Amino acid sequence: MNVSSGLAFVPLAMTPTYCATKAAIHSYTQSLRYQLKSTKVEVVELIPPYVQTTLMGDQMAEDPRAMPLKEFIDEVMSILQSQPDAKEICVKNVYPLRFAAESGQEKYESFFQQLNDSMHG
């Protein structure tokens, strides 16, 4: 299981390296899954949203905009149990990021702007 991020799909300008590496993990995971499709190896990608952890300090762990860690873990475990063949594990909180590009360029750009503005406010 590889762990990318919702920010692999809509980058946060204040953390460009983090977002770029998570996008690379997403790309790598897709390629690896394709390369191993004729084997018994399952390649799964976990795509977390913004989660309350101490990754960037205590402030992040208490940020009300972030998903509580226990909620995230509970939802991930539920998905793993109910969808054992899932190639991507996406909790509902990450859907806006994961599927932003599918909304079209104009909506994507608006979402990108709103996301980045909200993190600076």
Model-derived regions: residue spans:
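Rossmann-fold scaffold of SDR-type NAD(P)-dependent oxidoreductases
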Residues: 2
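Residue(s) in the substrate-gating loop at a strand-loop-helix junction
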Residues: 5
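Active-site-adjacent segment of SDR/Rossmann-fold oxidoreductases
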Residues: 10, 31-42
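Active-site loop immediately N-terminal to the catalytic Tyr-X3-Lys motif
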Residues: 12-16
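Active-site helix of classical SDR
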Residues: 21
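C-terminal helical subdomain
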Residues: 45, 61-105
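Short, flexible catalytic-loop segment of classical short-chain dehydrogenase/reductase
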Residues: 48-58
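Non-catalytic terminal and boundary segments that flank Rossmann-like NAD(P)-dependent oxidoreductase
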Residues: 107-121
